[in-house]
C-alpha cells in the first residue's frame, strides 16, 4: 500500500474587488513575469470596457463567455502499435474552465488593437454572443473529437 497521502485539491482564491474566482483565474493566466498588479489592471480595465459596451453586469458577461468557450470533449494523442491516434476524452469542469480561459486569452492576444484590456474585452463580449476565435477553437476541438470517434475505445 502506498504511503503517500492524498493531495487535497486547491480551490482558486477570489480577487479583492469582485470577490470572484473566475476573475482571479483569469488574472493568474494573464500574468507575465510575476507582474500581478499589472495583470489586475488589465482585467479591471477590460471589465470596465465590457460594462460600457454592453451596459449589463460584466461578471455575467464573463461567466457567459467562459461557459460558451468551455469544451465538453478534447482529443489526446495516444500511441498504439507504432501509430499515433487522436483519442477523444471527456473533460472535467475544472480542466474545461482552464482551457476556456487559455483559449480566450490566446484569442485576445491574437486580435489587432490598441491594448490588452481593449482586446480582452472585445473577445469576451464576442464569446458571450457566440462568435470570436475562442468559440471557433472550441468548435474545431469538438469537430476533431467527432472525427476521431472511432478511436474512443483506446482510452
From Swiss-Prot:
PROSITE patterns: RIBOSOMAL_S7 (PS00052). Its main location: plastid. Keywords: Chloroplast, Plastid, Ribonucleoprotein, Ribosomal protein, RNA-binding, rRNA-binding. It is found in: Plastid, Chloroplast. GO terms for biological process: translation. InterPro entries: Ribosomal_uS7 (IPR000235), Ribosomal_uS7_bac/org-type (IPR005717), Ribosomal_uS7_CS (IPR020606), Ribosomal_uS7_dom (IPR023798), Ribosomal_uS7_dom_sf (IPR036823). One of its GO terms (cellular component) is small ribosomal subunit. It comes from the Eukaryota. GO terms for molecular function: rRNA binding; structural constituent of ribosome. Gene3D superfamilies: Ribosomal protein S7 domain (1.10.455.10). Belongs to the universal ribosomal protein uS7 family. One of the primary rRNA binding proteins, it binds directly to 16S rRNA where it nucleates assembly of the head domain of the 30S subunit. Part of the 30S ribosomal subunit. This is Small ribosomal subunit protein uS7c. It comes from Phytolacca americana (American pokeweed).
